[in-house]
């Protein structure tokens, strides 16, 4: 059983026993005090210890000091002339304060569940191959270059590359995406994913501390250090508020009795009101519930594949009015695909076959798109005399035929005219031309595909009150215009260098409303300067990207732009709950403070205004998970 809960139960029993002794044993008041000190010290020794430690450190003003002062005063007030003993209330107040602390601990544990569950992505062991045997060791003991084996049902222990095997990986703990990811030999995999089917042999590419799982866990744990404006204000407020409360309580106890005929009896009455005032004034509900709300909100977002580096970035997300998108890799997939094949005097299959073989050894993204469209490399074709002309294309001898694959410039160099193609009229991607033995043979259309949820993402942002969506790209104006039209962004700027993007963001920052914030959304790899300059830097598709995790303030672990609106909604909900708690706690406390000052509030009501309000506020904070 929880030690604090056991103390609460024993104290309640001893308190009942002390009450019976007080009423039926006929003891003197000082003897009754000694009886009540047993349950009081049992339940309050740690609070008293913290209060004394604060005094010794010359920093006494906290909730422990307020509770110690109020309850000690309640224990002693009965010895004043004309005062009623308040032994039961003194122990009762401390008992309920500890009950509130117990509930706070429980709520914090529940809020940490999101983080604890996130810890489940951390593998316990790695099966490393050593001297022809497999040994289970701690992931921290594995070095870069070691070979590890991952069986079905096990977690990927460290980031690496598959040497052997095919499988499906469950990435839900990292991305929030339930659809498994298929992997095969040569694919890069990251730690924290669960291997669902086949046995995999991996070459370790990163040490444990540099692997994705460890970095994500560290990021979420560190998020608590970046306080929101509300959290920072509450902490500053509490440091000023508590001394003012103590001084006000002293004034309430000492000054009003001067206006009575007899000071001593009046002092006992006003001292009780001052002690009640102290109990009500304890700022627990504010100091505990508001940071807990943000902690729960950050933990809940992490379960949806959204890593927010602190409450301050939740503040900024909630006030977004301008969002600037990079185009490639953010609104589009960032990978070229063959869209259509338009042959001239040959079949589509033959044209694609020849182009793919000519580009077999090129590392250009367009060459990769052609090879992916025709993956049958091992078809016994003879490829000789490969020659690449910078800025034009590639030529090679394929099965005895000279095949040239490139742009308009290459065709002009060959002295070939390019026929007008009516089907290419509205195409804004790349057109790759093919010539065979000096004769024009057709062209292949290649483009970067728009993400499926890009339009929905922009529409959702407008619904949430984002008034300006801007797209920046280094691509050509025609391509930018088409993506802007298809997604619905309000403005776009094309043919920009990285420095131009920073300048555009600077201009947008100077133009924005003071109450609104600006976010830049990119891939986190090539956009670090812009991500750093924006009020909020959002990196998309950051799974496995160290650069993205370091550069951004908010990290979307998959590549869905629609998750930006989800991040905004979660942030706004978290802040709304924090404000709810603040206003609820303040309004109840002000009401009971007035009642206490006028003599209409007992310590029992004061306990509710403190512990009861804290419990309700903490329960409300848990909604942010």
Question: Predicted regions span which residues?
Answer:
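Conserved catalytic phosphorylation-site environment of P-type ATPases
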Residues: 56, 63-68, 174, 272, ...
């Amino acid at each position: 059983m929880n030690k604090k809960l056991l103390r609460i139960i024993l104290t309640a029993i001893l308190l009942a026993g002390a009450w019976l002794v007080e009423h039926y044993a006929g003891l003197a008041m000082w003897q009754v005090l000694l009886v009540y000190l047993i349950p009081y010290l049992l339940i309050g020794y740690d609070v008293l210890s913290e209060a004394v430690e604060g005094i010794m450190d010359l920093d006494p003003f906290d909730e422990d000091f307020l509770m110690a002062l109020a309850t000690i005063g309640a224990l002693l007030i009965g010895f004043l002339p004309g005062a009623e003993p308040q032994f039961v209330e003194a122990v009762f107040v401390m008992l309920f304060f500890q009950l509130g602390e117990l509930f706070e601990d429980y709520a914090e544990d529940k809020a940490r569940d999101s983080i604890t569950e996130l810890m489940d992505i951390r593998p316990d062991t790695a099966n490393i191959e050593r001297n022809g045997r497999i040994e289970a060791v701690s992931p921290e003991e594995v070095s870069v270059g070691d070979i590890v084996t991952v069986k079905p049902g096990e977690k990927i222990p460290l980031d690496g590359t598959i040497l052997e095997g095919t499988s499906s990986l469950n990435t839900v703990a990292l991305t929030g995406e339930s659809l498994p990811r298929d992997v095969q030999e040569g694919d890069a995999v990251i730690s924290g994913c669960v291997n669902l089917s086949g046995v995999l042999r991996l070459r370790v590419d990163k040490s444990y501390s540099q692997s994705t799982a460890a970095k994500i866990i560290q990021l979420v744990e560190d998020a608590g250090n970046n306080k929101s404006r509300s959290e920072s204000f509450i902490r500053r407020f509490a440091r000023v508020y508590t001394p003012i409360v103590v001084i006000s309580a002293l004034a309430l106890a000492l000054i009003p009795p001067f206006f009575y005929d007899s000071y001593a009896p009046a002092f006992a009455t006003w001292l009780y009101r001052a002690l009640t005032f102290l109990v009500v004034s304890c700022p627990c509900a504010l100091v505990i519930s508001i940071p807990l709300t943000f902690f729960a909100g950050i933990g809940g977002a992490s379960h949806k594949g959204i890593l927010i580096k602190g409450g301050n970035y939740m503040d900024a997300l909630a006030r977004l009015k301008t969002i600037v998108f990079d185009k490639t890799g953010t609104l589009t997939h960032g990978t070229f695909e063959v869209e259509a094949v338009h042959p001239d005097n040959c079949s589509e299959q033959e044209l694609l076959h020849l182009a793919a073989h000519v580009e077999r050894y090129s590392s250009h993204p367009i060459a990769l798109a052609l090879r992916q469209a025709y993956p049958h490399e091992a078809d016994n074709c003879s490829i000789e005399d490969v020659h690449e002309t910078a800025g034009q294309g590639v030529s090679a001898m394929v099965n005895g035929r000279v095949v040239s694959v490139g742009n308009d410039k290459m065709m002009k160099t060959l002295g070939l005219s390019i026929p007008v193609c009516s089907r290419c009229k509205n195409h804004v991607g790349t057109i790759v031309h093919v010539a065979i033995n000096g004769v024009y043979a057709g062209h292949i259309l290649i483009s970067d595909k728009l993400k499926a949820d890009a339009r929905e993402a922009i529409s959702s942002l407008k619904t949430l009150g984002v008034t300006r969506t801007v797209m920046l790209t280094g691509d050509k104006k025609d391509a930018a215009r088409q993506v802007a039209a298809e997604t619905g962004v309000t403005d776009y700027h094309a043919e920009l260098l990285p420095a131009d993007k920073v300048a555009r963001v600077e201009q947008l920052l100077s133009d924005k409303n003071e109450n609104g914030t600006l976010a830049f959304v990119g891939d986190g790899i090539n956009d670090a300067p812009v991500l750093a300059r924006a009020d909020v830097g959002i990196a998309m598709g950051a799974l496995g990207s160290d650069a993205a995790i370091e550069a951004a303030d908010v990290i979307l672990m998959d590549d869905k732009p629609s998750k930006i609106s989800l991040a905004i909604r979660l942030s706004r909900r978290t802040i709304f709950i924090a404000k709810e708690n603040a206003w609820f706690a303040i309004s109840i406390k002000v009401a009971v403070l007035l009642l206490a000052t006028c003599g209409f509030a007992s310590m029992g009501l004061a306990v509710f205004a403190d512990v009861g309000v804290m419990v309700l506020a903490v329960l409300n904070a848990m909604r942010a998970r």
